[in-house]
Amino acid sequence: MNPILHPLIDNGITPGDPNFAGGNLYCKCPQNKVTVTLKSNVAHNHACGCSKCWKPTGALFSVVGVVPRENLSVTANGDKLHVVDKNAVIQRNACRQCGVHMFGRIETEHPFKGLDFVHVELSDTRGWQEPQFAGFVSSIIEQGFDPSKMETVRSRFKAVGLETYDSLSPPLMDTIAAYTARKNGKLSARL
C-alpha cells in the first residue's frame, strides 16, 4: 500500500489561477474558527517533509507556501493562537484548541524574514498556486519512515510532475546563498 503523501498531491494536483487574489484560511475547530486573511496568492508552494510543519492526519508531508507578511492578517479569534516553539526560526502560530498551524513568521534575521508561511488547504476557496516541488524529502526518515521505501516516495512525486529535493528548490537555495553572501560582504547589495 502506498503511503499518504498529502491529499493535495495524492488526489491529483489542481492547477492554480495565476490571477488569484487571495482568501481566508480557517482552523479546524467546529466553531469560533481562527481566520487568517491573505491578500495575495502564495509563492513557492511545495510539499515539505520536515518535522516542524503541520500536516493533515496520516500525511507524510505538509504543503506550505509563502506570502509577504503585509498580505497576512488575523481576522477572527486571534486570541486562540499561540507559538508552538518559541526557539524555532519559523514561529508557527497554531490554534490552541485544534492544533492547526495557521501561519509561520520569522522574527529574527533570516533570508526569508518578511514572508509568512501558510497552508492553503485550510481555505475553502480554489485558485491557490499548486505545489511546485517537494522539499526536505529525506527528513521523513528522521520521523520514522522506512528508508527502503524512499524511492517509492520520490517516484510518486515525479509521477505528478514534482521534483524532489533534500533541501529547498534551487531558486530558494540561491536566495539563501545570495543573502548570506551580501551579509558577509561577498556580493553587492544591488544584486
From Swiss-Prot:
Xref: PROSITE patterns: CENP_V_GFA
Domain of life assignment: Eukaryota
Co-factor binding comment: Binds 2 Zn(2+) ions per subunit.
Boundaries of every CENP-V/GFA domain copy: 20-166
InterPro entries: CENP-V/GFA, Formald_GSH, Mss4-like_sf
SUPFAM superfamilies tied to this protein: Mss4-like
Keyword presence, Transport: no
Pathway annotation from the record: One-carbon metabolism; formaldehyde degradation; formate from formaldehyde (glutathione route): step 1/3
Cofactor: Zn(2+)
Pfam families xrefs: GFA
Reaction equation(s) it catalyzes: S-(hydroxymethyl)glutathione = glutathione + formaldehyde
Protein residues bound to Zn(2+) 1: C27, C29, C95, C98
Residues the record lists as binding Zn(2+) 2: C48, C50, C53
Keyword set includes Lyase: yes
GO molecular function terms attached to this record: S-(hydroxymethyl)glutathione synthase activity; zinc ion binding
Record EC number: 4.4.1.22
Alphabetized UniProt keyword annotations: Lyase, Metal-binding, Zinc
UniProt-listed GO biological process terms: formaldehyde catabolic process
Family: Belongs to the Gfa family.
Function: Catalyzes the condensation of formaldehyde and glutathione to S-hydroxymethylglutathione.
Classification via PANTHER family: CENP-V_GFA DOMAIN-CONTAINING PROTEIN-RELATED (PTHR33337:SF40), GFA DOMAIN-CONTAINING PROTEIN (PTHR33337)
Name listed for the protein in its UniProt record: Putative glutathione-dependent formaldehyde-activating enzyme
